[in-house]
Amino acid sequence: MRKYIAIIIASLALFTGQAHAQRCLPKMQGIEIRANMADGFNPGGNNGGYSFGAALSTYTKKGNKWMFGGEYLLKNNPYKDGKIPVAQFTAEGGYYFKILSDARKIVFVYAGASALAGYESVNWGEKVLHDGSTLHDRDAFIYGGALTLDVEFYVADRIALLANLRERLLWGGDTRKFHTQFGAGVKIIIN
């Protein structure tokens, strides 16, 4: 009898499947914090740009997700020996489709589209430049959208590292309409 029980226990131990993490379940929510470079990699130069953002993502069926958040983008435009800053403050709402994931649910790749609306400030509202020139671009409300390719890499059950590539298209302002962004971030699952 002992031999029979030992064989059953050994077979159960050997033939059981692995348990996988339960990630991206419907109604799970996470807070994302991101940092991006905008329009190329030019840190500290007269033509550099960067953005910071935070968002709340809520997962739906099949691992897709809704995303709602805000972002601050600063793009410096070269002017003679200086620069003219253009800042954008935007709110975002969008839907992302899961296009790829591994079997162990560690890496997820998403493609999504978002609607954006916000405010653009050119040279922080100052019309006269440092050399006495007058700036004709004005502050304005902006609106548009973004296409995003997003990768999540889970390092723990509730913590994921993020990488993203996105293209923003915004109307209403006097400056550039397109902004390409790439960057990294972290996501913390809150429920």
Give each language-model segment a name.
Residues 1-28:
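Cleavable N-terminal export/targeting peptides
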Residues 3, 25-29, 62-64, 101-107, ...:
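Short coil turns and loop connectors of transmembrane beta-barrels in diderm outer membranes
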Residues 20-75, 187-191:
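Short glycine/proline- and aromatic-enriched beta-strand/turn motifs that initiate or cap beta-hairpins
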Residues 27-31, 46-52, 83-91, 107, ...:
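Residues that define the transmembrane beta-barrel architecture of outer-membrane proteins
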Residues 39-42, 77-84, 131-137, 169-173:
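Extracellular loop and loop/strand-boundary signature of outer-membrane beta-barrel proteins
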Residues 55-130, 188-191:
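Gram-negative (and chloroplast) outer-membrane scaffold detector with strong preference
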Residues 73-75, 150-191:
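Predominantly the C-terminal beta-signal and adjacent terminal strand-loop region
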Residues 124-165, 188:
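Extended low-complexity acidic/polar segments
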